[in-house]
Amino acid sequence: MVDESKLQCYHKGCGLLFDPKENDNEACTYHPGGPYFHDAYKIWTCCDKKSTDFGTWMNYKGCTRGKHSNEKPVDIVKVAAVKEIRPEKEEDVIVWKGLNKSGKLDSKDATKRIEQNLNVEVTPGATAAIEKKLKEISEAAQSADIQIGAPCRNNGCSTEFDGSKNKENCQHHPGAAIFHEGMKYWSCCNKKTSNFGAFLEQVGCTSGEHKFRNNEIVSKFREDWFSSNGFVTINVYCRGALPETANIVSDGHTVRVSMKHGFGNASVDLDYDLWDEVIPEESRVVIGERKVEISLKQKHGTGWPRLKFDPELDAKNDEEA
């Protein structure tokens, strides 16, 4: 039963209930700075702690002590936006006017392009490997000592380990956090908001078991690509990619990839500005045991000199053509 005399602390990195009568200058450990998202990294501006994994980043312990506060923060997205990602001089900025050589593509307003989820298939081998590994992780966690107060690592859950088995259902988001064009949402339920605080308060869409421990798994991955028979194929080599967290979308000119791998303990976020146009509805994704294969149907039958559009190289080729 909730103690109505206690208030909710809205400091970033805290989120605990507190008694106003016992709120001194050492009561709260939090992040006074705002969140900052750049090149797949999630960063706290106050201490520069960063991670590509949203859950790991959210669980970084605060860097400052002070009193708890029950005042809800203003839209901190606007504050974070003041920080420049690339403060180039105006004359150094390259203006992108196309994804290919001039005249090769029909003119298209980028703001009107609609992203589509690519069809995802999972191989039987990948399904079996995931089930086996997750069972091993669950059994290991139950037998290992867990520190009292350890937070649940599932996205959207703030439950702390209290010494019992914590068998009550864990309401959480199994998907990955997506940040795109000012919007924040979970790939598992797609409830979008521009307010970071509202995003964090979204109730989980799935019930399951709490996860009080992170298992150390290598988070490295590599990628390559090739073209054959009218398809351009991107291979992302990583073990234990979780299908339910995969958010792979394309608007025909770009592809965005966000998913958890390492059986849920690492994440990858990739963005591709493609050299030429593809057909999303005729493209597909195959999640295997050790790699994720993204096959993109080419709209034009021409060969691709490279996977990504390069403003400098393609502008130069345009002039020489």
From Swiss-Prot:
SUPFAM superfamilies: HSP20-like chaperones. Signal peptide: none annotated. Residues 218-308 form the CS domain. Zn(2+) 1 binds at residues 9, 14, 28, 68. CDD domains: p23_CS_SGT1_like (cd06466). Zn(2+) 2 binds at residues 31, 46-47, 63. Keywords: Metal-binding, Repeat, Zinc. One of its GO terms (biological process) is centrosome duplication. Residues 9-68, 152-210 form the CHORD domain. InterPro entries: CHORD_dom (IPR007051), CHRD1 (IPR039790), CS_dom (IPR007052), HSP20-like_chaperone (IPR008978). Zn(2+) 3 binds at residues 152, 157, 170, 210. Zn(2+) 4 binds at residues 173, 188-189, 205. One of its GO terms (molecular function) is zinc ion binding. Disruption phenotype: RNAi-mediated knockdown results in reduced fertility and in high levels of embryonic lethality with none of the unhatched embryos reaching the comma stage of development. Among the 40% of embryos that hatch, 98% reach adulthood, but have a reduced brood size, and the remaining 2% do not survive beyond the L1 larval stage. Surviving adults have defects in vulval development, whereby 3-5% have a protruding vulva (Pvl) phenotype and 1% have a multivulva (Mvl) phenotype. It comes from the Eukaryota. Regulates centrosome duplication. Controls the secretion of the tyrosine kinase receptor let-23/EGFR from the endoplasmic reticulum and is required for the localization of let-23/EGFR to the plasma membrane of vulval precursor cells. It thus plays a role in positively regulating let/EGFR signaling, and anchor cell and vulval precursor cell alignment. Plays a role in vulval development and morphogenesis. PANTHER family: CHPADIPLOID STATE MAINTENANCE PROTEIN CHPA, CYSTEINE AND HISTIDINE-RICH DOMAIN-CONTAINING PROTEIN 1. This is Cysteine and histidine-rich domain-containing protein 1.
